[in-house]
Amino acid sequence: YDNSVETFIMRGVDLIFIPEPATAQMLREHGLNALCVRQFAEDGYDDYVFYFSEMIRQIWGSDKAVSEKIDMWQSDFTTALNTVKQTLDAHPEIQTQTLYYINGEKDRGLGYTDLGKSLLETVYKALKIDFICNRFESNRPSVEAVLEIDPDIISIGGIYQKKRLNELYSTEPWNQIKAVRENKVYNIPVGFVGFEQTCSASALFIYSQANQIYPDLFDFDLVALTQECLQKYFDYTLTDNAAQNLLDGYFKDGSFMIE
């Protein structure tokens, strides 16, 4: 996370997308082109999902290949969301489960999360999941606040996810949470960024969580879907083993992202 002016100038960066408005303003004051694109929306994320892709279309849409990829991404996301939603809607007997999300993108412990109004909340709503993080006053809830709700499921994302997972099972009173006791703790894969962010793999986030939360209903071929995604958007070929390692929260060679 090197946001220094010197780094961007040295790399000859033409345009910077960044989620922090203060940093974007600072970069602009130093003559760099910086746009603030946030990963949440005050009025809810459902109508904001395509905002970033449409911004890219405005900037580079004169290139037919770019516009076609934007259409492809929007279609992939919509298809994934509708597929899981329609399947779950056909099963009214399914009970809503509560979920706590641990943001492992930075090394900030088990009490670092997302407050909702984000892609996470949009996806979990389609998955018939009660995303409890939107109840907290800050993105650093106490263990007592999480224990009070006692979530059925915990999902962990980010490059520190294995470190967080080990802490979760070995640290009291975190390991007394229902999700931990019943072994309903799921990882979120990381590609170029975490799948739970608005990114090329957003559709894969939907499929992977559906597989983990509802294994009796969904069995998407995540290895094939991941390979297809990387090939389609980046012309990058991933072996079966590399794709599986990525899905399991490791580097493609099977090593830990963070020791």
Residue spans for each PLM region:
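Short, well-structured alpha-helical interface segments that form or flank functional binding sites
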Residues: L115, P141, L204
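Extracytoplasmic substrate-binding proteins
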Residues: T23-G109, N187-I258
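Short, surface-exposed loop/turn motifs that are enriched in glycine and acidic residues
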Residues: G109-D114, R135-F136, E144, F195, ...
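Active-site/pore-lining binding-face segments in mid-to-C-terminal subdomains
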Residues: I153-I213
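Short, conserved, surface-exposed binding loops centered on an aromatic residue
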Residues: D89-I94, V123, E144-E148, I177
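Acidic/His-rich segments in extracytoplasmic proteins that coordinate ligands and/or metal ions
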Residues: Y1-G61, N134-Q176, K252-I258
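Short, structured coil segments at secondary-structure junctions
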Residues: H30-N33, L127, R181
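Alpha-helical, coiled-coil/dimerization segments enriched in small aliphatic residues
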Residues: Y112-S138
